Amino acid sequence: MARGKFITFEGIDGAGKTTHLSWFRERLEQKVASTGRSVVMTREPGGTPLGEQIREIVLHQKMDLETEALLMFALRRQHLAEVIEPALARGDWVLSDRFTDATFAYQGGGRGLPRDKLETLERWVQGGFQPDLTVLFDLDPEVASERRSAARDPDRFESESEAFFSRTRAEYLRRAEEAPYRFAIIDSAQSIAQIQRRLEELIAIL
């Protein structure tokens, strides 16, 4: 069986990506069902028993910037080894809520960690491995902030300033500009129906 495909959803908190994940997964399962493949849904930080334990620490405990980035990549290595790589090897498709682009956007753009440090970690952990498709949900940080304000018990990332998310968004868009062959940018200000039509188009060409 041919190797599976790896799809990631990205975007700043409040951009709406998580809202569309389950719907996208259902449509993807319909696409691959006739081939005997499955769709594995996962997330970062997390995705493994170890990752889910440390996720709580990363999201709620203040820490040194470099410690935060190192934890993200350490969890990613385990995620790749335990979940992503085995699933792709057996022909399944993997759909992840965030991956490496989030680290460049949040720890790099948002927190200001030098890009070369992140690139070194990326090469060490992933080699040349990248998603087949990254769907970036793009939204003005001010609008995203209004959406986040309704969240209960926000974590320490969701509680960041609008300026933080402006930097995070800018880094996401820079990453997308550098790799247009794998990025699809969706304007999250559109209606749910419009967004789902665009997602249907993406599924059709996978």
From Swiss-Prot:
GO terms for cellular component: cytosol. It catalyses: dTMP + ATP = dTDP + ADP. Keywords: ATP-binding, Kinase, Nucleotide biosynthesis, Nucleotide-binding, Transferase. ATP binds at G11, I12, D13, G14, A15, G16, K17, T18. It is an enzyme of class 2 (transferase). GO terms for biological process: dTDP biosynthetic process; dTTP biosynthetic process; dUDP biosynthetic process. InterPro entries: P-loop_NTPase (IPR027417), Thymidylate_kin-like_dom (IPR039430), Thymidylate_kinase (IPR018094). This is Thymidylate kinase. It comes from Paraburkholderia xenovorans (strain LB400).
